[in-house]
């Protein structure tokens, strides 16, 4: 006796079924599922204070420039206490060599 009935495309090979159900669609009812959808995080930027940084060794003219000027130098070239050219200090940050003031 053959293990498969003539309805091979509809029915897998197995024992002979009690009812001929080759033309009936296979319907399977599953239990309801619950899916939780998490929202993606949102980045909020609040306005805050604007902080500016300045080089620590930048000197702005003041009444103490005569006392401090003798200890300041730009790449080994001393800065005179009687006033100096700012290009000497600023050129240090631009990659060019400082010239004597």
Curated annotation (Swiss-Prot):
The keyword Cytoplasm is assigned to this record: no
GO terms for cellular component: intermediate filament
Classification via InterPro entries: Keratin
A Gene Ontology molecular function term of the record: structural constituent of cytoskeleton
Record flagged with keyword Hydrolase: no
UniProt entry keywords in alphabetical sequence: Acetylation, Keratin
Modified residues (N-acetylserine): 2
Complexes and interactors: The avian keratins (F-ker, S-ker, C-ker and B-ker) are a complex mixture of very similar polypeptides.
Family in the record: Belongs to the avian keratin family.
Name of the protein in question: Feather keratin Cos1-2
Naturally occurring in which organism (per UniProt): Columba livia (Rock dove)
Classification of source organism: Eukaryota, Metazoa, Chordata, Craniata, Vertebrata
């Amino acid at each position: 006796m053959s293990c498969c009935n003539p309805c091979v495309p509809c029915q897998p090979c197995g024992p002979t079924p009690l009812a001929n159900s080759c033309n009936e669609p296979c319907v399977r009812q599953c239990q309801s599922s619950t899916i939780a959808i998490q929202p993606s995080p949102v980045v909020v930027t609040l306005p805050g204070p604007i902080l500016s940084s300045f080089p620590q060794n930048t000197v702005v003219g003041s009444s103490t420039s005569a006392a401090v000027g003798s200890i300041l130098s730009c790449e080994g070239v001393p800065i005179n206490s009687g006033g100096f050219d700012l290009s000497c200090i600023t050129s240090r940050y631009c990659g060019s060599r400082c010239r004597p003031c």
